[in-house]
Regions:
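A basic- and aromatic-enriched beta-loop-alpha substructure that forms the phosphate/nucleotide-
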Residues: 62-68
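Soluble or luminal CAZymes and related metallo-dependent hydrolases
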Residues: 11-15, 70-74, 152-157
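Conserved catalytic core of nucleotide-sugar-dependent glycosyltransferases
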Residues: 101-157
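Short His-Asn-centered micro-motif
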Residues: 4-9, 35-38, 73, 89-91, ...
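N-terminal anchoring/stem segment of glycosyltransferases
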Residues: 1-62
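Conserved small/polar residues in nucleotide/adenosyl-binding loops
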Residues: 159-164, 168
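GT-A fold catalytic core of metal-dependent nucleotide-sugar glycosyltransferases
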Residues: 70-111
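Short catalytic/ligand-binding loop motif for oxyanion handling, primarily in non-cytosolic enzymes
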Residues: 42-43, 95-98, 119-122
Length: 169
């Protein structure tokens, strides 16, 4: 399994150190990958220093992206070519304790949610099969010219399992 997230340069500066520390502490055996929009040389070097694979996906965006384009950021480069399941997180959603992650999925996307004020919060993380990740990437590419108003359309793209977990912040 691969742990994956995506970030623009601002979110990278705010959250990368925490994401890197927690993912290496909780899941040291998992390969880590990050998609970056407009990264600095220093940010690329941080990835190298922490043995985190990265892709610069700036070229996939229009010259002057809007806020709505960034709703697609984490969906445009799910690394399905590794042919491993992908634990996709937001860079600001951190694992706080180990969870028994499924090795074999019987659904396309296994969503991880947490309680928030008595209700289930948004999707904190999800596990994708390589096949479902490819579907999501291809769909996100079709939306870049007309980006969504939120990331909700992408969260609803696949059949998902109800799996609330109180293991992510």
């Amino acid at each position: 399994m691969i742990i994956y997230c995506a970030a623009d340069r601002n979110y990278f500066d705010l959250y990368f150190d925490l994401w890197e520390k927690q993912t290496s502490k909780i899941y040291p055996e998992l390969k880590r990958h990050i998609a970056l929009h407009n990264p600095t040389d220093e940010q690329k070097q941080k990835c190298y220093d922490h043995l985190i694979d990265f892709n610069d996906i700036t070229e996939w965006f229009p010259e002057n992206p809007t806020k709505n384009h960034f709703y697609l950021l984490r969906w445009l480069y799910l690394p399905y070519l590794y042919q491993q399941n992908i634990l996709e997180t937001q860079i600001n959603c951190l694992p706080v304790k180990e969870m028994n992650l499924p090795n074999k999925l019987d659904v396309e996307q296994w969503r991880i949610q947490r309680p928030k004020r008595g209700y289930l919060g948004g999707v904190s993380a999800a596990i994708f099969t390589p096949k479902s990740a490819e579907k999501v990437v291809n769909h996100a590419k079709t939306m870049i010219d007309n980006p969504p108003l939120s990331d909700h359309p992408m969260n609803c793209l696949l059949y998902t399992s109800p799996s609330p977990r109180d293991m992510w912040t």
